[in-house]
């Protein structure tokens, strides 16, 4: 029978890269049996949000954009980073407006999950936005090119290729009883 898992001890920690896009550190660790695990790389991102937005007809408002890491153009939920001092709820409302020009008076928190607890420090906060209506034009960051689509919920989960986008969809479908 194997030993019970236990937290490692961090012996040393150093920043490897820190710029506007990637905060990477290297930890030198030791497990409870004294084995060295070094370096262990950790990405220190801030929290993210993921929003499944529905219009008044319960159709999904989704975004489509190029994702360079995977080298694909993909459909996804509305998402982005939580700014310092901003609540996840405020970030969800802000990203919905910026990426799509839509807003909702019924933003429902669906819980949070770890982005990747193996080597990320951040969580993904999942939201359902109901009764969304277009109130503005998109307000995109430099380098963003995002198409907005209104699609049926039927089969949408199969079209979402990012894991936390799928999880947001599943959590929303569960909340809606579908």
Where are these regions (language model features)?
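Conserved Nudix-box catalytic region and its N-terminal flanking loop in Nudix hydrolases
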Residues: 3-7, 43-45, 49-94, 142
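Beta-rich strand-turn-strand
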Residues: 85-90, 99-106
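Acidic, metal-coordinating catalytic segment for phosphate/diphosphate chemistry
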Residues: 11-50, 56
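Nudix hydrolase/Nudix homology domain
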Residues: 2-8, 73, 84, 113, ...
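Acidic pyrophosphate-coordinating catalytic loop
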Residues: 15-20, 113-124
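Active-site-adjacent beta-strand/loop module that shapes the phosphate/pyrophosphate-binding cleft
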Residues: 25-33, 117-135, 149
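A short coil-to-beta-strand element that immediately follows conserved catalytic motifs
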Residues: 9, 103-110
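Short loop segments at secondary-structure junctions
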Residues: 32-34, 55-57, 66, 129-134, ...
């Amino acid at each position: 029978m194997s030993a019970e898992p236990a937290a490692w001890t961090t012996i040393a920690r150093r920043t490897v890269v820190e710029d506007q896009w990637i905060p990477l550190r290297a930890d030198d660790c030791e497990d409870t049996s004294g084995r060295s695990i070094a370096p262990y790389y950790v990405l220190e991102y801030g929290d993210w949000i993921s929003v499944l937005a529905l219009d008044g007809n319960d159709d999904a408002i989704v975004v489509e954009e190029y994702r360079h890491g995977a080298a694909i153009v993909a459909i996804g939920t509305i998402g982005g980073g939580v700014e310092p001092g901003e609540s996840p709820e405020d970030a969800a409302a802000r990203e919905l407006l910026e990426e799509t020009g839509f807003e909702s008076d019924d933003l429902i928190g669906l819980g949070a999950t770890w982005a990747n607890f193996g080597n990320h420090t951040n969580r993904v906060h999942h939201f359902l936005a109901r009764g969304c209506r277009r109130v503005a034009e998109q307000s995109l960051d430099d380098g963003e090119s995002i198409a907005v689509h209104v699609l049926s919920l039927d089969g949408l989960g199969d079209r979402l290729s990012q894991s936390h986008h799928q999880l947001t969809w599943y959590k929303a479908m569960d909340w809606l009883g579908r």
